[in-house]
Regions:
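Short S/T/G/P-rich N-terminal loop/turn motif that feeds into the first structured element of a domain
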Residues: 1-69, 76-100
């Protein structure tokens, strides 16, 4: 079953940082396995990401194998300590109906 993933990143994680992470992963050309759609934006001074995934397992695999390592790499390249970036607030919702 498809899931909607909503990430609200800690203050200090800018939209430009998420752009750099997205660019480094190259997901504009092709989404990772299980990914259906991704958007990120800024609201109320915080970066947000919203994704649609085939499953929670596909999302979790992507986070561990790709997203976290790339976020660390981008943080270091920007002179930041990856351990101090913090974790996003994550909400996972099962999708009742998906129209493509």
């Amino acid at each position: 079953m498809a899931v909607l993933i909503e990430d609200v990143f800690p203050v200090g994680v800018s939209i430009e940082f998420l752009d750099a992470v997205t660019d480094e992963m190259g997901v504009d050309a092709e989404l990772p396995p299980g990914g259906i759609v991704h958007v990120h934006f800024e609201r109320d001074g915080r970066a947000h990401g919203v994704d649609l995934w085939d499953s929670v397992e596909a999302y979790e695999q992507f986070v561990q194998s790709t997203l976290m390592p790339v976020m660390g790499k981008v943080a270091v390249a920007r002179g930041l300590d990856p351990s101090k970036i913090g974790e996003p607030e994550v909400t996972i919702t099962e999708v009742h109906r998906l129209v493509r």
